[in-house]
Design a protein with these regions (language model features):
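Short, acidic loop-to-helix structural element flanking the phosphoryl-transfer center
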Residues: 72-110
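Glycine-rich phosphate-binding "P-loop"
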Residues: 68-81, 138-145
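Acidic, Mg2+-coordinating phosphoryl-transfer loop and its flanking beta/alpha structural elements
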Residues: 105, 165-207
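Phosphate- and divalent-cation-binding pockets in alpha/beta enzyme and binding domains
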Residues: 24-27, 86, 110-114, 179-180, ...
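Substrate-recognition "cap/lid" segment bordering the active-site pocket of phosphatases
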Residues: 113-168
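Short acidic-hydrophobic, aromatic-tinged amphipathic segments that line or gate anion-handling sites
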Residues: 125, 203-208, 212
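Active-site neighborhood of HAD-like aspartate-dependent phosphohydrolases
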Residues: 1-51, 58-62
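Surface-exposed amphipathic alpha-helices with a cationic face
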Residues: 88-96, 150-151, 155-162, 182
């Protein structure tokens, strides 16, 4: 018998990686503002409560809009993003074993559309970029399910599917995964970027292949 019924994943740093360990927001802010200092400043403002998550998204996307960003420019900027080794095989094997799969992430939909267009996920919670008929960026629908909201998303999926929360698992890597890791019945810190996540997760898994999580999901 499976120990869990649902496994949800973060994306940036968990399923998708960059050679310099950048996430998609850092890449696009640097591309369209010419500097990476805005990332650190807004992150600090968010963590200190000076801005909300929705305001953080609006500020970043506002800069991209001011720069006249287009779909093709965004795709060119993120071309160095790659799937973590073993993603396709691992997800396929988890499905074969009967697990429901989901994404709960602060990433952008264009990342999944580009790198995992035929993904196996039953539920996908992330930020959605909006383009006009000429493929110019016109806005973004900010997910209400990042950081603390990730735990709420997990509860919503579990309730809808009739799955007890203790039979839900989560795999992530960063500060915004801490609360959902606490909420889940089982959590894995995959190549964690912060000590707090390592401390709250049931197990830490390190390596370049997602298949390393499979022994924990028989």
């Amino acid at each position: 018998m499976r120990p869990y019924d649902l496994i949800c994943f973060d994306v940036d740093g968990t399923l998708v990686v960059h050679p310099e360990e950048k996430i998609v927001w850092e890449i696009l802010n640097t591309r369209f503002t010419g500097s990476d200092t805005v990332n650190r400043t807004r992150y600090e403002h968010y963590r200190s409560g000076r801005i909300t998550y929705a305001q953080w998204v609006a500020l970043d996307v506002g800069d991209w809009l001011a720069a006249g960003a287009t779909r093709s420019e965004i795709l060119a900027a993120i071309e160095d993003l790659r799937l973590v080794g073993g993603v396709h095989g691992t997800l396929a094997e988890l499905r074969r074993r009967g697990y429901k799969l989901g994404i709960i992430s602060g990433t952008l939909d264009i990342v999944i559309e580009t790198l995992l267009p035929e993904h196996p996920f039953d539920d996908v919670f992330l930020n959605k970029l909006l383009f006009d008929e000429k493929n110019a960026l016109v806005g973004c629908h900010a997910t209400p399910y990042d950081v603390d909201g990730k735990a709420r998303a997990l509860r919503e999926i579990a309730a809808r599917e009739g799955i007890p929360i203790e039979r839900c698992a989560f795999v992530g890597d960063a500060f915004n995964d801490v609360e959902v890791a606490r909420e889940a019945g089982f959590s894995i810190a995959f190549n964690p970027k912060c000590r707090e996540l390592s401390d709250v997760c049931n197990i830490v898994v390190r390596g370049n292949d997602l298949a390393a999580i499979l022994p924990h999901f028989p």
